[in-house]
C-alpha cells in the first residue's frame, strides 16, 4: 500500500487563507460597539446639559418670584391658571372691597348723625323794654356735624334725636335771687326744659354766683332753644368760662 501524503490529509480551505483564523467579523463587531458607546455617552451628556439649563431657568424664576413677592397681578406668574379663574378672583376681590367701602360709608354717616356737638359762648346780653327778661346772644365756639344751628339768641334743631343739654350763667348782680330758664319753642307751643335759681350776696364785691343746669331731652326738628334770665338788665359775666350753652347728640 502506498504511503499517504501529508498534503492529502490537510483540510481544504478557501484560497489565500492558508488555514489561518477568521478575524474580519470580530473586528467589525468591536468597531460597532465602540461607536455605539460613544454615541450613548454623547446623548447622555446632551441630556444632562438640557436638564441643567432647565434647572437654572427654574431657579431664576423662583428668585424672581421671591423678589417681587409673588406672581404679577395680570397672571403672568401663573401661566397654568385659566382666565375664568382669574376673572372670578378679581370679581370676588372687587366685591369684598365694595362691601368694605359701603360699611365704612354707613358707619361714617351714622357717626356724623349721632355725634353732633355745639358749644356756644356769649356775645352780649340785652333786655327788651316790653318784658322783664334778659336774653343772651350766642356764637359757636365748638361745632361738629350739621344737626344744630346757632341763630342769634337761640339754637335751631336740624336733626331730631336725644341730646345732652347744659347751660351756665355767671351772675354779677346784687339782686337777692338770680336764675336762668332754658326753654324750647316748637310744634306750636313753648316749654320750659329746666331752670336754676341762686341767692346773691348783697355786697357788690361778693356778688358773684353761677347757675349751672344740665339734662337729657328728646328734641324735634325745627325746635328753637334759648336761655332767658327773668330779670330786666341783669348783670352777667360774659366770659367764655363763666357763661356758656352746649348740646351733644347721644
UniProtKB/Swiss-Prot annotation:
Q: Which GO terms describe its cellular component?
A: cytoplasm; cytosol; extracellular exosome; extracellular region; extracellular space; membrane; nucleoplasm
Which BP terms does GO give this entry? immune response; positive regulation of B cell proliferation; positive regulation of cell population proliferation; positive regulation of isotype switching to IgA isotypes; signal transduction
Disulfide bonds, paired cysteine numbers: 196-211
Name the segments for region: Disordered. 61-82, 89-108
Q: What is the lineage of its organism?
A: Eukaryota, Metazoa, Chordata, Craniata, Vertebrata
Q: What does this protein do?
A: Cytokine that binds to TNFRSF13B/TACI and to TNFRSF17/BCMA. Plays a role in the regulation of tumor cell growth. May be involved in monocyte/macrophage-mediated immunological processes.
UniProt-recorded Gene Ontology molecular function terms: cytokine activity; receptor ligand activity; signaling receptor binding; tumor necrosis factor receptor binding
Tissue-wise expression: Expressed at high levels in transformed cell lines, cancers of colon, thyroid, lymphoid tissues and specifically expressed in monocytes and macrophages.
> What InterPro entries does UniProt report for this protein, alphabetically?
TNF_CS, TNF_dom, TNF_Ligand_Superfamily, Tumour_necrosis_fac-like_dom
Annotated positions for site Cleavage: 104-105
Write down what this protein is called.
Answer: Tumor necrosis factor ligand superfamily member 13
User: Could you tell me which residue ranges the THD domain spans?
Assistant: 116-250
The protein's organism comes out as Homo sapiens (Human)
- Its gene name is TNFSF13
Amino acid at each position: 500500500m502506498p504511503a499517504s501524503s501529508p498534503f492529502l490529509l490537510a483540510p481544504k480551505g478557501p484560497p489565500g487563507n492558508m488555514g489561518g483564523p477568521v478575524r474580519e467579523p470580530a473586528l467589525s463587531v468591536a468597531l460597532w460597539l465602540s461607536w455605539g458607546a460613544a454615541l450613548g455617552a454623547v446623548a447622555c451628556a446632551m441630556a444632562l446639559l438640557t436638564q441643567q439649563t432647565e434647572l437654572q431657568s427654574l431657579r431664576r424664576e423662583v428668585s424672581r418670584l421671591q423678589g417681587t413677592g409673588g406672581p404679577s397681578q395680570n397672571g403672568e406668574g401663573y401661566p397654568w391658571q385659566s382666565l375664568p379663574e382669574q376673572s372670578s378672583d378679581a370679581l370676588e376681590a372687587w366685591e369684598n372691597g365694595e362691601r368694605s367701602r359701603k360699611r365704612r360709608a354707613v358707619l361714617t354717616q351714622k357717626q356724623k348723625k349721632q355725634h353732633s356737638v355745639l358749644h356756644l359762648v356769649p356775645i352780649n346780653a340785652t333786655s327788651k323794654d316790653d318784658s322783664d327778661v334778659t336774653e343772651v346772644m350766642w356764637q359757636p365756639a365748638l361745632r361738629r356735624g350739621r344737626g344744630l344751628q346757632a341763630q342769634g339768641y337761640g339754637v335751631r334743631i336740624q336733626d331730631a334725636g336725644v341730646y345732652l343739654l347744659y347751660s351756665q350763667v355767671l351772675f354779677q348782680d346784687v339782686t337777692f335771687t338770680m336764675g336762668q330758664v332754658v326753654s324750647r319753642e316748637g310744634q306750636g307751643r313753648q316749654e320750659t326744659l329746666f331752670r336754676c335759681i341762686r341767692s346773691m350776696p348783697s355786697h357788690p364785691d361778693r356778688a358773684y354766683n353761677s347757675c349751672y343746669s344740665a339734662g337729657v331731652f328728646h328734641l324735634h326738628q325745627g325746635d328753637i332753644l334759648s336761655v332767658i334770665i327773668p330779670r330786666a338788665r341783669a348783670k352777667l359775666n360774659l366770659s367764655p368760662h363763666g357763661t356758656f350753652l352746649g348740646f351733644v347728640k347721644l
